[in-house]
């Protein structure tokens, strides 16, 4: 099993690489790529960690050696948010980066499962899809927007509020991966009751959690460490499913059969080909129904921007 981390010298990429070096199954190959010349050094540093995962780093303009033979590609390349920016401000730089990487993937490893971390995910996933479609290699089962950060934040904040162990909390998060498009389904959290005020406050906090970190870092970056953990959780789930484990379910932003938008985050069952089944997100509360209706114009607008950009 070969996993490639693209954008591996950045804050998310280094955190993700560290976690994968420690947690990938024995015998896995981990390839790191970044345009930054430090990347082979990041791999050298990580190679000293005594786990049965081989690691190589590649720098420069061409990601081909990292992508060759990859089963899973995790893309975190791009610029990070600074105070005052929202995820849409990142579009101007990051859209071009994702487009050129998708063009490479289409040639070098068209059968790989590709997880996109690079924001704005609502828009970068449709860009990658359009590029892969043009190249005639698109398989909607193998392209994911990684929204797991919204899930782990939801689990953490619910556990904090209710005095629970976070590992016992499961919160499906649907929609997209920015602002109002993030919808945690708090009505579905088992064994926990919320007041209407708690639901509203928690939902807002989960939606604005990225900004919370950007402001707390005071210009020194965005959510890199928690995003590394989230991407690792999703990446490992994908690896387990590709290796034949049954019943692996995570939320992800995929092109499914959603009635709401061409791309939509919801629980997906993972299997040997990527997405085995897009699962129903179940019954919504009145608050959640209203929030879903209220986000769709924004989400569909984000998707259209990506489709137009890739034309």
Swiss-Prot record:
NAD(+) binds at residues 7-13, 34, 94, 117-119, 227. It holds the Pfam family Ldh_1_C. It is an enzyme of class 1 (oxidoreductase). It comes from the Bacteria. It catalyses: (S)-malate + NAD(+) = oxaloacetate + NADH + H(+). Its EC number is 1.1.1.37. SUPFAM superfamilies: LDH C-terminal domain-like, NAD(P)-binding Rossmann-fold domains. Belongs to the LDH/MDH superfamily. MDH type 1 family. Catalyzes the reversible oxidation of malate to oxaloacetate. Homodimer. This is Malate dehydrogenase. It comes from Vibrio parahaemolyticus serotype O3:K6 (strain RIMD 2210633).
């Amino acid at each position: 099993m070969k996993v490639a981390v693209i954008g591996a010298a950045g804050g998310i990429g280094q955190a993700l690489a560290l976690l994968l070096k420690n947690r990938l199954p024995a015998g896995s190959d981990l390839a790191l790529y970044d345009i930054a010349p430090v990347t082979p050094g990041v791999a050298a540093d990580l190679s000293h960690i005594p786990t049965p995962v081989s690691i190589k780093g590649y720098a420069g303009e061409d990601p081909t050696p990292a992508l060759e033979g990859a089963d899973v590609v995790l893309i975190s390349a791009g610029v990070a948010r600074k105070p005052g920016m929202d995820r849409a401000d990142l579009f101007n730089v990051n859209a071009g980066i994702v487009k050129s990487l998708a063009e490479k993937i289409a040639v070098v490893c068209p059968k790989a499962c590709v997880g996109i971390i690079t924001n704005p995910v609502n828009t970068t996933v449709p860009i990658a899809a359009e590029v892969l479609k043009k190249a005639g290699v698109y398989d909607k089962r193998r392209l994911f927007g990684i929204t797991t950060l919204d899930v782990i934040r939801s689990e953490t904040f619910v556990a904090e509020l209710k005095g629970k162990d976070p590992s016992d909390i499961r919160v499906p998060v649907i929609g997209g991966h920015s602002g109002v498009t993030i919808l945690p389904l708090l009505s579905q959290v088992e064994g926990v009751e919320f007041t209407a005020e708690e639901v509203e406050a928690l939902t807002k906090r989960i939606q604005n959690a990225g900004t919370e970190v950007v402001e707390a870092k005071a210009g020194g970056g965005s959510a890199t460490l928690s995003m590394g953990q989230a991407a690792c959780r999703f990446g490992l789930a994908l690896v387990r499913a590709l290796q034949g484990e049954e019943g692996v379910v995570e939320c992800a932003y995929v092109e499914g059969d959603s009635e709401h938008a061409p791309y939509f985050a919801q629980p997906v069952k993972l299997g040997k080909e990527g997405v085995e089944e897009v699962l129903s997100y179940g019954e919504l509360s009145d608050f959640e129904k209203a929030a879903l209706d209220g986000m769709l114009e924004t989400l569909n607008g984000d998707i259209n921007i990506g489709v137009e950009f890739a034309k």
